[in-house]
Regions:
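Transmembrane-helix signature of polytopic, membrane-embedded enzymes
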Residues: 4-7, 28-51, 70
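Transmembrane-helix motifs of polytopic, lipid-linked glycan transferases
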Residues: 11-36, 74
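Specific aromatic-rich, kink-prone transmembrane helix
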Residues: 27-30, 67-85, 97-99, 115
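Membrane-interface transmembrane helices that cradle and orient dolichyl/undecaprenyl
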Residues: 33-36, 75-91, 102, 124-127
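Short acidic/glycine- and proline-prone juxtamembrane loop motifs at membrane-interface regions
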Residues: 54-68
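Perimembrane helix-loop-helix junctions
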Residues: 78-84, 112-148
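Membrane-interface alpha helices of multi-pass inner-membrane proteins
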Residues: 91-107, 150
Length: 258
């Protein structure tokens, strides 16, 4: 607003992601308080999540991954509150806002929207009577859907108007990628498992291009942190330490819940 410096503009844009990272850290902290009895355990949970190398990296530059992580943390926080307090008005309003913002991030974050619907519907079943509480289901469900529409609906309406009904923008994105992208990234030239006749199992063990690992190992180590175009890997020791810590935690909690 007050300068034409390109550097200042870039830093200002990055600050949005920094603030989203702070928001995600706060929600993760609150989730830890709700999930664990001991404060120390909840804080360790927040530290392990927020200081993952991949997490720190994603909140340091301009992208929509930050919004996706922030909103999914908010959604998980609402799930935890719903388990503890029930679907109160405050929880429903927060859930609606969180889901609406999530819709404005990446499509691959939409799984949380689907599971939120399943989780909410499950909560509306009276377990003792094995009956649906239809009144609460419709009342609170419509409230959340209305908030989602207010937060995110305008974007999809705009896209539908601008792109001849392509409200998701996927077809338009492919058209412009074919027109303007470099040759190896044009949709018609991209090498995909589906074009190679691979099965799901083949895809899991496939090592594409110059990658060092197959898809399964890449997913595991990128959970901790992989950079560039998923081709810059951290020292293996760091990835192994993180994965061992998470594995021990999962096994320990599973043992206690038996």
């Amino acid at each position: 607003v007050f300068t034409d410096s390109f550097r200042a503009t870039v830093i200002a844009a990055r600050m949005v992601n920094v603030l989203l990272g702070c928001g995600m850290a706060w929600f993760t902290w609150k989730i830890g308080e709700l999930l664990f009895r001991k404060k120390e355990t909840g804080r360790l949970f927040a530290v392990l999540v927020c200081f993952l190398p991949g997490t720190c990296f994603l909140f340091s530059y301009i992208n929509t991954d930050g919004l996706a992580l922030f909103t999914t943390a908010w959604i998980l926080y609402c799930w935890c509150r719903a388990c503890k307090e029930g679907w109160t008005l405050k929880v429903c309003i927060q859930m609606g806002i969180a889901m609406g913002l999530c819709m404005l991030s990446y499509y691959n974050a939409y799984g949380y929207l689907l599971m939120s619907a399943v989780f909410f519907a499950g909560c509306m079943m009276k377990c003792g009577e094995q009956k649906w509480d239809w009144q609460q289901l419709l009342k609170k469900g419509c409230l959340m859907l209305g908030i989602v529409f207010l937060v995110a609906g305008w974007w999809f309406i705009r896209s539908g108007i601008l792109y001849d009904g392509d409200f998701l923008g996927m077809k338009t994105s492919s058209i412009y990628a074919e027109k303007y992208a470099i040759d190896e990234l044009k949709p018609s030239n991209r090498v995909l498992p589906v074009n190679m006749g691979m099965s799901v199992l083949d895809m899991i063990w496939w090592v594409p291009g110059e990658w060092q690992h197959n898809w399964l190992v890449t997913v595991l180590v990128s959970f901790v942190g992989t950079f560039g175009h998923l081709d810059i890997f951290m020292p293996y020791l760091w990835s192994k330490v993180y994965l061992i810590v998470f594995a021990v935690g999962i096994l320990g909690n599973s043992w206690r819940l038996r």
